[in-house]
């Protein structure tokens, strides 16, 4: 079995009205090792429909998308990349809607590649739910795990989703024990974080005034 961990950035939240402006997919073998990667920028055809906040978050600008592909060029690349793979995404329903909208808008009929995917939100709920995590966004999970801040760029977020997928899949007793250890470490780190500056200040004072 092969997987494609993926993320999309869009001009808003409504598939079939807003548009996908970037896609990243990381293809994995059965051992969850990366074997290929696809990063595509897509030129929006109906920018007047775009949500300004969505464009701000994903960093869209005409100059940064000057080399973007037209939807007719991007769709076959994405379709071929995903073929015979199980999709993996953080909120798969959202990404699936925009990929399907792109395929249908460009007249593609090979929609069977959009098979049922694996949602890392569901995996996260199963793994972190018992520990009272209040949000299952990539940003919240990454913050708890001490990962770099989410950038809302397709490739960066796909890399983060891939790391989360490797951490949580497949769910097993071994994985559960690993998660328990990670959450415990995160809680300890969270308790200590507010005191780091104070400890650094005390250490500096000690070095300057207490040592002989």
Regions picked out by a protein language model, each given a short descriptive name:
Residues 13-15, 125, 163:
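Conserved protein kinase catalytic core
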Residues 117-133:
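Short alpha-helix plus adjacent loop in nuclease-associated cores
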Residues 10-12, 122, 160:
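Short, glycine/acidic-enriched loop or turn micro-motifs at the edges of active sites
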Residues 86-93, 97-103, 132, 136-189:
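Acidic, Mg2+-coordinating catalytic module of metal-dependent nucleases/exonucleases
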Residues 36-37, 122-125, 168:
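A short, structure-level motif marking secondary-structure boundaries and short turns
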Residues 178-211:
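Short hydrophobic helices that act as membrane-entry/anchoring signals
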Residues 1-100, 108-114, 138-145, 152:
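Conserved non-catalytic scaffold segment of RNase H-like nuclease domains
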